[in-house]
UniProtKB/Swiss-Prot annotation:
This is Nucleotide-binding protein A2cp1_0112. Gene3D superfamilies: 3.30.70.860, YajQ-like, domain 2. It holds the Pfam family DUF520. It comes from Anaeromyxobacter dehalogenans (strain 2CP-1 / ATCC BAA-258). Keywords: Nucleotide-binding. Belongs to the YajQ family. NCBIfam families: PRK05412.1. CDD domains: YajQ_like. PANTHER family: UPF0234 PROTEIN YAJQ (PTHR30476:SF0). It comes from the Bacteria. GO terms for cellular component: cytosol. Nucleotide-binding protein. The keyword Glycoprotein does not apply. One of its GO terms (molecular function) is nucleotide binding.
Length: 162
């Protein structure tokens, strides 16, 4: 039976490249000179923005988002947290990277597939949703229904098998 998987993944190499490009641009741009604005990454691939003011932190976030968009990373995978005051009158902002399909989102995808009335079955398998059907056309209709639902996370369709 034909099947495919619905997953939510982020290409970490592209995130790394965009992060490095944004860090270089912030270091070189005239409007960031002397503002102590910097980008850092942690073990979980989250980005920490440190800046001298809220405006510079927001501008650094915009630079990062611009570089990510140019590299093909979906901006829905970013989860910017609230600006926090830091020592020395600076501010910091953590930007988390959403990776993997949470159970609630997977359940919503399964419910959307079932309510669409297409003759396919959807099952949650870890951090993916496996959709199986008898015809390839049914699977393509299921993909269209999932895309039309406009979920707030980036979705990819993988392992399309006949």
């Amino acid at each position: 039976m034909p099947s495919f998987d619905v997953v939510s993944e982020v290409d970490l190499m592209e995130v790394e490249n965009a992060f490095n490009q944004a860090r270089k641009e912030i270091a070189q741009r005239f409007d960031f000179k002397g503002t102590h604005t910097e980008l850092e990454r942690d073990k979980e691939q989250n980005v920490l923005i440190r800046a001298g003011s809220e405006g510079r932190a927001e501008a650094a976030l915009q630079v990062l988002m611009e570089k990510l968009a140019k590299r093909g990373v979906a901006l829905e995978s970013l989860d910017p947290q609230k600006l926090e005051p830091a020592s020395g009158g600076h501010v910091r902002q953590l930007v988390k990277l959403k990776r993997g399909l949470k159970i609630e989102d997977a359940r919503k995808i399964v419910a959307k597939v079932k309510e669409s009335g297409i003759k396919v079955q959807a099952a949650i398998q870890g951090e993916a949703v496996r959709v199986t059907g008898k015809k390839r056309d049914d699977l393509q209709a299921a993909i269209h229904a999932i895309r039309a639902a406009a979920f707030p996370i980036p979705l990819q369709f993988q392992n399309f098998r006949d």
